[in-house]
A protein has these predicted regions:
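Hydrophobic alpha-helical connector segments
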Residues: 65, 72, 76-105, 119
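Basic, helix-initiating cap at the start of DNA-binding domains
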Residues: 1-31, 35-44, 61
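Short, structured helix-loop boundary elements
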Residues: 17-18, 38, 60, 64, ...
Length: 192
């Protein structure tokens, strides 16, 4: 097959997968996890059921694929925040702020049933480890630069940041998220 034909087929497959994942996520948001069926997903995505089954065997697989994509997008956003700053302090603040706003946004859109289903997956544990490593490395860099306290091990400071900023999921206003980031950063500064 010519390369152009292969590229077109690959693009079409990606579009069908994306439309399917978006349709399933939208249906869960509207109807709840248990009300979503393959028929409803196919109808919402604008494809036939037979086509849908060529891509995904069940709703759970669709939602796991959607969640995996969301996680990858969030991690990439944090990496971009880190890479967009030029000093250890600025990198740390940028990543903490980005993480807080991701938590704020996703926490307001996850119902508890969906979150319980998605967060039992091993991909979530892997993503948490990547997040932990990213933040720990920034804290270690900040400690070496004198902008992060050294009297507490970086792993403990990482846990502090992640737990503190996860509270942003329950905050209503972006200003409150900004204040939470400032308080978290204040706890990271060297004493004295």
């Amino acid at each position: 097959m010519p390369k152009l034909w292969n590229d077109t087929i690959d693009a079409h497959r990606r579009e069908v997968r994306e439309a399917t994942m978006e349709a399933a996520a939208a249906l869960v948001a509207e109807l709840g996890l248990r009300a979503v069926t393959m028929s409803r997903v196919a109808e919402r995505a604008g494809i036939g059921r037979a086509t849908l089954y060529k891509y995904f065997p069940d709703v759970e697989t669709i939602l796991r694929a959607w969640h995996e994509r969301q996680i990858a997008t969030h991690l990439e956003h944090l990496v971009q925040a880190r890479d967009g700053a030029d000093t250890p302090a600025a990198r740390l603040e940028a990543v903490l702020k980005a993480y807080a706003f991701v938590s704020h946004h996703t926490g307001r859109h996850h119902d508890t049933e969906l979150a319980a289903f998605l967060h039992q997956d091993e991909q979530v544990a892997k993503a948490r480890q990547q997040l932990h490593t990213l933040l720990r490395d920034l804290l270690t860099e900040g400690a070496s630069a004198g902008v992060v306290r050294v009297d507490i091990p970086p792993d403990e400071l990482t846990a502090y940041c992640l737990h503190a900023l996860s509270a942003s999921a329950g905050l209503r206003a972006p200003d409150a998220v900004e204040r939470l980031v400032k308080v978290t950063l204040a706890g990271l500064r060297p004493p004295g």
